[in-house]
A protein has these predicted regions:
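Extended alpha-helical coiled-coil "stalk/arm" regions
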Residues: 28-92
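Amphipathic protein-protein interaction modules
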Residues: 76-121
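Short, charged, intrinsically disordered terminal tails
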Residues: 142-146
Length: 146
C-alpha cells in the first residue's frame, strides 16, 4: 500500500521547485542578454560614432528596440497559407537565423539567444504548473487547519 507523503514535505518540495524554476528563468534572461550583446548589430548600435542614417536603420521607429537578427526573426512577415501576411512560425524563425546562404539574417549569437528563449518558454510552463501546485497545497492546508 502506498504511504501518503506528509503535507509539510509536499509544501517544502513544491516551494523548492518553484524557487528553482524562478532562478532558472532569471539565469536564462541573463544568457539571452549576453548572447544578444555579442550580435554585430547590437555592437554597432552601442557605437557612439555611427551616423544618423545608420542609427535610423538600426532602431525600430515604433518601439526603439535595436533591430537585431533576432528582432527580424520575430517581426518579419511572410505570406500565410490563406494569402495574408503573418509572422514566421518557429521553423521559419530558426531557418531565418541559421540560413547558411544569407549573411544578412544569419547570426550565431541571435540564434543562441533564440534557442534559450525557446527553452525558457518550456521552463515558464513548468513554473506555471509549480504555481498551480502551490495554490492547490495552500487550499489543502486551509482545509486541514482548525
Amino acid at each position: 500500500m502506498k504511504q501518503a507523503i506528509p503535507l509539510e514535505t509536499r509544501v517544502i518540495t513544491a516551494l523548492a521547485n518553484h524557487e528553482r524554476l524562478l532562478q532558472q528563468v532569471g539565469q536564462m534572461k541573463k544568457q539571452i542578454g549576453a548572447h544578444l550583446a555579442e550580435c554585430p548589430v547590437m555592437k554597432k548600435a552601442n557605437d557612439w560614432s555611427i551616423s544618423a542614417q545608420d542609427s535610423k536603420d538600426i532602431y525600430d521607429e515604433k518601439t526603439g528596440l535595436v533591430k537585431t537578427h533576432l528582432w527580424g526573426a520575430f517581426n518579419e512577415l511572410v505570406e500565410g497559407s490563406h494569402g495574408g501576411m503573418v509572422r514566421m512560425n518557429l521553423d521559419d524563425q530558426e531557418n531565418y537565423l541559421t540560413d547558411p546562404w544569407c549573411d544578412e539574417t544569419r547570426c550565431d549569437h541571435c540564434y543562441a539567444a533564440w534557442r534559450v528563449i525557446q527553452d525558457r518558454r518550456d521552463v515558464r510552463q513548468e513554473l506555471g504548473q509549480a504555481r498551480r501546485t502551490l495554490r492547490m497545497l495552500g487550499k489543502l492546508a486551509l482545509r486541514v487547519m482548525p
